[in-house]
Amino acid sequence: MYFYGMKNTHPFLLAAFLCLFLAPSCSKKSGSSAQTCQIITVTDQLGTGTTTYNITYNNSGQISTEQYATGGQNYNRVFTYLGSTEMISTSNGTNTVIDSVTLNSDGLIVTDYETIGTTLNVTTNTYSGTELQKQVQVQNGGTPSTTTYTWTNGDLTGSSSSTGTSTYTYNTKASEAGDYWSIVQLVNYGSSFVKTAHQLAGYQIGTTVENVNYTYDNTGKITAVTGTSGTSVETISYQYTCN
């Protein structure tokens, strides 16, 4: 699978082209009572490689910390919030990446100033309502890289940049915690810049085609998402805590 525009410290191999995130909580019906559920463990398996993310939340239900190990190194990601500003610090004990993120009134990411050593990456998102229309990325004040997006019936269905075009398809189920866009953005940003009406079912980037399938429990929560491209299969599974 390919996670677009992911952070350099993000080990998901679904990485490549755009950057994204959704709300971490979901609702579960149990008799006449409703429970609020949050993803606390994400296990990403590709071939013989496995990465596990352990996630905690603050009292407001926002992601607070995230720990994972990849490439023989342990990473700690800390999220802090002040008004419309979100700060994200990702460290392996030697190097630290800092993101300063500004959110709009819909809670969507407008700007992300990412500092990696002496490198500054600035991402600016433009919306029509809650639909991402354009994303501009600039590194160290250099030449801007622009991606534009198209939407159909509340779903992101296409993107175009100087490197090519991509198309996206969806199933008929409403988007929820644990679906493709949701988990990409939760793990990387704790906030969103793409919110779709339905769950991503597949996409094509150039000649690469990926099919995305979901596993649900008996309450309807997503417990795993599987990406298949040719002979490559990646499975991301979840554990929840419910109150």
Which residues does each PLM region occupy?
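Short hotspots in intrinsically disordered terminal tails
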Residues: 2-3, 240
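Bacterial N-terminal signal peptides that target proteins for export
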Residues: 3-13
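Sec-dependent N-terminal signal peptides
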Residues: 12-20
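C-terminal motif of bacterial Sec signal peptides marking the signal peptidase cleavage site
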Residues: 22-25
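Buried hydrophobic residues that stabilize the cores of well-folded domains
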Residues: 28-243
